[in-house]
Amino acid sequence: MSVEPPPELEEKAASEPEAGAMPEKRAGAQAAGSTWLQGFGPPSVYHAAIVIFLEFFAWGLLTTPMLTVLHETFSQHTFLMNGLIQGVKGLLSFLSAPLIGALSDVWGRKPFLLGTVFFTCFPIPLMRISPCRVWWRAPVVPATCGRRMA
């Protein structure tokens, strides 16, 4: 004597995820029988290319005024110092991106995004109001760490 469940319960059980299973919540994930949940469609290389372009464009906007300050400070070695700064930026980005990414997975993305944006923007007015020329170094580290979050 076997008792079969009604067909409505079978369909409901088949559509629900197993206990403990996490439904996909990332951008571009598609739920069964629905349209795209978030974002502009499935992830593609073009989305990454836009983000990379914006990062280098923003860094270029900061490099132009920084060259003026570098020329005033190191008149004989302006481009050498710019290359050194760019190299340190790349190294710090390489080291900080996985660390900040892992921490943001644990504590959430919003606090890290807000923090990196704040620490990226905070030193720029200080460069303008400071009587000494030490502040030109300040945007390098936060900009390096902050730009890799996006």
Curated annotation (Swiss-Prot):
Parts of the chain on the Cytoplasmic side: 71-82, 133-150
Record key words, sorted: Membrane, Transmembrane, Transmembrane helix, Transport
Transmembrane segments: 50-70, 83-103, 112-132
Gene Ontology CC annotations of this record: membrane
Presence of keyword Nucleotide-binding: no
Gene Ontology MF, one: transmembrane transporter activity
Location in the cell: Membrane
Bilayer topology: Multi-pass membrane protein
Region of interest (Disordered), ranges: 1-25
Similarity comment: family membership: Belongs to the major facilitator superfamily.
PANTHER family per record: HIPPOCAMPUS ABUNDANT TRANSCRIPT-LIKE PROTEIN 1, MAJOR FACILITATOR SUPERFAMILY DOMAIN-CONTAINING PROTEIN 10
Protein name: Major facilitator superfamily domain-containing 14C pseudogene
Species this protein is from: Homo sapiens
